[in-house]
A protein has these predicted regions:
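Peptidoglycan-targeting cell-wall enzymes and recognition modules
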Residues: 2-9, 16, 35-110
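Short, functionally critical alpha-helical segments immediately adjacent to catalytic or ligand/cofactor-binding
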Residues: 21-38, 119
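Residue-level detector of well-ordered alpha-helical segments, enriched
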Residues: 23-27, 57, 86, 114
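Hydrophobic/aromatic-lined pockets within catalytic cores
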Residues: 19, 32-36, 95, 123, ...
Length: 152
């Protein structure tokens, strides 16, 4: 099974920001459960523009964070459902208002611990499904060998 192309985009953005493979796998394990890496999915499965109700995008941003995504898209003159825009917004959050969560994730040593830390401090999901996120992170970790290649 190959890694979802959207997951590759997110992984490369995170690698460029200095995240390790274990950290990247933990983040991606969460997004696998949140959205299957679909940047245009609304909570409940409807695909399209953000509705403002429930989560949106690969990170399932809600409330003020979804508003932040939409405003960020306007500033960048991009579609809020664009995978590259959302990857940039993820880094924007991790380097800004969610820096504490980013630092916590970076303190983890395994994909499973990274997944748990990202869940508790960044996603803050109503239904955690911690074990499933950790299992997804472990599976994804095994598919991140491309990050070891020069130029990636």
């Amino acid at each position: 099974m190959s890694l979802n192309p959207n997951a590759v985009i997110i992984a490369n953005k995170l690698k460029g920001a200095g995240y390790s493979k274990a950290h990247i796998a933990g983040v991606l394990g969460n997004f696998q459960l949140e959205s299957g890496f679909n940047p245009r999915v609304n909570e409940g499965g409807k695909v399209g523009a953000p509705t403002g109700v429930g989560g949106y995008g690969f990170g399932q941003w809600t409330g003020g964070r979804q508003t932040g995504l939409v405003n960020f898209a306007k500033q960048q003159k991009m579609d809020p459902g664009d995978i590259n825009l959302q990857a940039k917004f993820l880094l924007h959050e991790l380097e800004g208002p969610e820096k504490k969560a980013a630092d916590y994730v970076r303190g983890a040593v395994s994909p499973e611990e990274s997944a748990r830390r990202f869940l508790t401090d960044f996603e803050r999901a109503g239904v955690p499904k911690t074990k499933q996120r950790q299992e997804a992170a472990r599976a994804i970790y095994g598919q991140l060998g491309f990050l070891d290649q020069p130029g990636q």
